Design a protein with these regions (language model features):
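Bacterial N-terminal signal peptides
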Residues: 9-17
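N-terminal periplasmic/intermembrane-space "pro-region" immediately following the signal or transit peptide
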Residues: 21-92
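Outer-membrane beta-barrel channels and translocator barrels
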Residues: 72, 121-125, 169-171, 181, ...
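Residues on the lipid-exposed face of transmembrane beta-strands in outer-membrane beta-barrel proteins
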Residues: 79, 107, 111-120, 161-166, ...
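Transmembrane beta-barrel strands of outer-membrane/channel proteins
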Residues: 79-87, 129-133, 176-178, 226-230, ...
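Surface-exposed coil loops of outer-membrane beta-barrel proteins
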Residues: 88-108, 137-161, 168-250, 259-266, ...
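Outer-membrane beta-barrel pore domains
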Residues: 100-103, 140, 147-155, 256-262, ...
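Glycine- and aromatic-enriched membrane insertion/assembly motifs of diderm outer-membrane
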Residues: 103-136
Length: 425
């Protein structure tokens, strides 16, 4: 009996355990669902502040982003400071160089050019205002004339450019005011050139003009400029005549450029007989590789003689010589440039030049053979940043006559070392 009773108790307990296990298995899915709901609710409650913060941050970022209705400021401001030390081997007593506008003060540190500017360019209008200072400014504007009380000659020397323009067509613009001249290969701003100083041909063509300019494209590879100006590098006109010229630029390929610039106008004051000047400037530039540039220019100029009597200079002094006809005076100029950036931060630039103005049409030396000069210039550039340019320049020039200041006298040679540092933003 006891054995049967014990068996009954064991079977009952085992059956009860199985029933309890089945009941637990049936209830576990519901329990898990409830637990999942509780976990999800708690997770949402915990994550809700983070999502709100993300949404607030997103809204703030969207507010900071410019919308299509907001216009960007079209005005861009910039400046340049170009300082130099000219160690002239001629060591002129006056410390002043002649026949150049660049680095004119010798054996002292000075500012060649400094300017601040504001530029604007949109689809419909454009313009630039730049105020400038420096020794090159004083030298370059020395010939600016005075024709009246309000002729503005005292203030324009500090005005590098002041012009405005608007679009006439798809690629046609009309500008008016004071702006850079169109003759020559090198820029007025040395920071943009391969060589620190300027070629003679660039120092004696207009860096600036005052007038009206029409520019545009004839084809995708051919562009033009038409100019009406007060004169040859003058803002204040010295006569009643209008001067002008044009530019044609052809880019047959992406690395080849040809340019033809012209000028025509009377350069004599109203009180003197008219002498028309005609100037042609031809330029070719080739960039066979990304860091290599080869360029050349050839200039030819003619100017009428006012009379058959021509002033010439002899060993015995100046005298007038009667000509058979009032033929034109002539000048011929040639330049070659080579620039190679052999390392990311280093570049070498060289220039060869020849200037022939025997009859002193543009450059007056008061010497027998006039201005017949040639030379070579080399500049080594260190470019630690696109805005910074450290330059080491050597320049050698030789003239047929003794015209260059040399201590208390003159010399046929002009040699100098120039160190310069410029920052352009």
């Amino acid at each position: 009996m006891r054995v049967r009773f014990l068996k009954f108790i064991c079977i009952f307990c085992f059956s009860f355990a199985l029933v309890g296990l089945e009941a637990q298995e049936k209830k576990s899915p519901e329990t898990l669902k409830i637990q999942e709901k509780e976990i999800s609710v708690s997770t949402k409650s915990a994550e809700q502040p983070t999502e709100e913060k993300k949404e607030d941050t997103y809204i703030k970022e969207e507010e900071l982003k410019p919308t299509s209705n907001q216009k960007k400021d079209p005005v861009v401001f910039g400046f340049l400071v170009d300082g130099y030390y000219n160690a002239s081997l001629n060591r002129p007593d006056s410390k002043e160089l002649q026949y150049t506008t660049q680095a004119t003060r010798t054996n002292e540190y000075n500012i060649n050019l400094a300017y601040v500017d504001a530029k604007v360019e949109t689809d419909k209008y454009r313009g630039r205002l730049a105020l400038q200072f420096g020794t090159s400014v004083v030298a370059n504007y020395g010939g600016e004339g005075t024709t009246g009380k309000t002729s503005n000659e005292t203030s324009i020397r500090n005005m590098q450019e002041a012009y405005g323009g608007f679009r006439l067509g798809k690629s046609t613009w009309l500008d008016a005011g004071i702006y850079f001249g169109h003759l020559g290969y090198e820029s007025w701003i040395s920071h943009e050139n391969f060589v620190y100083t300027r070629a003679f041909s660039l120092d004696y063509v207009p860096y600036y003009v005052s007038g009206v300019r029409l520019s545009g494209k004839i084809t995708e590879k051919l562009s033009y400029q038409l100019h009406l100006n007060n004169g040859y590098q003058v803002v204040t006109d010295n006569n009643k005549d209008i001067s002008g010229g044009f530019r044609l630029e052809w880019n047959p390929t992406g690395n080849l450029m040809f340019r033809w610039n012209t000028f025509a106008g009377n350069e004599q004051p109203t009180a003197t007989p008219k002498e028309m000047r005609y100037y042609n400037n031809f330029i070719a530039e080739w960039k066979p590789f990304e860091h290599l540039t080869l360029a050349s220019s050839f200039d030819v100029g003619y100017q009428e003689r006012a009379s058959r009597e021509d002033l010439v200079y002899t060993d015995n002094g100046p005298l007038y010589v009667r000509r058979d006809s009032n033929a034109f005076r002539q000048i011929y100029v040639g330049n070659i440039w080579f620039a190679y950036r052999f390392l990311p931060e280093w570049r070498i630039g060289t220039r060869l030049e020849r200037y022939l103005d025997r009859e002193q049409m543009i450059i007056v030396t008061n010497s027998k053979d006039g201005f017949q000069t040639g030379g070579a210039t080399a500049t080594l550039d260190y470019i630690p940043d696109p805005a910074v340019l450290v330059r080491f320049t050597y320049q050698y020039r030789r003239s047929m006559d003794s015209i260059y200041p040399h201590e208390a006298h003159t010399s046929k040679l002009d040699r100098m070392f120039i160190f310069s540092l410029s920052i352009k933003i």
